[in-house]
């Protein structure tokens, strides 16, 4: 019986594996083409017969990127924005998720529903109101105009996701900690925080990518002070409508991708366990 069951499963398993492989190829091909174009000479990039390989790889595009005067500044600004968003949103989301899970108060369910509704509002619909808000707050042309909106948009998802991790921690564990003399602060940071850390990593990945790749807010809120621009804005330096430098665009995009890949490599184990744990709720 088991043998027949295995034989019936093989075609479906093979079809699933082939489908997964095809999806992986489709997803990875643009990344491969970006890196390939970054190493191609200008003549091959502009050729009317594109080829998925190059016989004469060149570092000229990367040289132009790093010789661009403000590129290092853009990189540092992106790092400051992304790290600030990750740290602040993770801490606030952890405390908020604990509050809405452990405490009983009026409008608690309404608040949770509002977290869900907030995720349905497109960012583009709020860009103009946010522009006037940042103008009135004196935050235009500052990194604060990028950090604050990203924190606001990342918190609903982070709180809702972390709520499942906090809920999975038995209340008996909290009671035992209090019986042993632990304060609420000690329980939060020494017991609960390590237990929900995989969830924090998972939410931090989404927050980091959103802040790192942001172009809309950077273009809308950084108007005149280019020293406050981020890496996505650096692509405009190489893209000119009359004479686009596609090699520079692809090289800059490749450099932009490296920190994200490093971040994924460092947190991949925690990320998998975090996404797996999020399914429980």
Whereabouts are the PLM-identified features?
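Actinobacteria-biased recognition of intrinsically disordered, low-complexity terminal regions
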Residues: 1-2
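A structural signal for multi-pass alpha-helical bundles of membrane permease subunits
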Residues: 6-8, 12-281
């Amino acid at each position: 019986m088991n043998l027949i069951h295995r034989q019936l499963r093989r075609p479906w398993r093979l079809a699933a594996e082939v489908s997964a492989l095809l999806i992986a190829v489709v997803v990875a091909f643009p990344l491969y083409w970006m890196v390939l174009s970054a190493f191609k000479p200008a003549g091959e990039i502009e050729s009317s017969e594109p080829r998925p390989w190059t016989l004469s790889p060149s570092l000229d595009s990367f040289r132009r990127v790093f010789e661009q005067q403000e590129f290092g500044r853009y990189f540092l600004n992106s790092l400051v924005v992304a790290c600030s968003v990750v740290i602040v949103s993770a801490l606030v989301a952890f405390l908020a998720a604990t509050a809405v899970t452990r405490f009983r108060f009026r409008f608690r369910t309404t608040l949770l529903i509002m977290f869900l509704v907030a995720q349905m509002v497109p960012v583009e619909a709020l860009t103009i109101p946010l522009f006037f808000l940042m103008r009135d707050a004196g935050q235009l042309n500052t990194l604060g105009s990028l950090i604050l909106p990203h924190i606001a948009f990342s918190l609903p998802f982070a709180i809702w996701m972390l709520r499942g991790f906090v809920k999975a921690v038995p209340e008996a564990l909290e009671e035992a900690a209090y019986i042993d003399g632990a304060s609420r602060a000690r329980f939060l940071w020494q017991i609960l925080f390590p237990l929900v850390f995989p969830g924090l990593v998972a939410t931090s990945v989404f927050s980091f990518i959103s802040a790192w790749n942001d172009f809309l807010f950077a273009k809308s809120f950084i108007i005149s002070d280019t020293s406050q621009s981020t890496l996505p804005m650096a692509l405009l330096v190489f893209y000119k409508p009359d004479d686009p430098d596609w090699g520079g665009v692809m090289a800059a995009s490749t450099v932009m991708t490296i920190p994200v890949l490093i971040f994924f490599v460092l947190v991949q184990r925690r990320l998998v366990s975090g996404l797996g744990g999020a399914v429980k709720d």
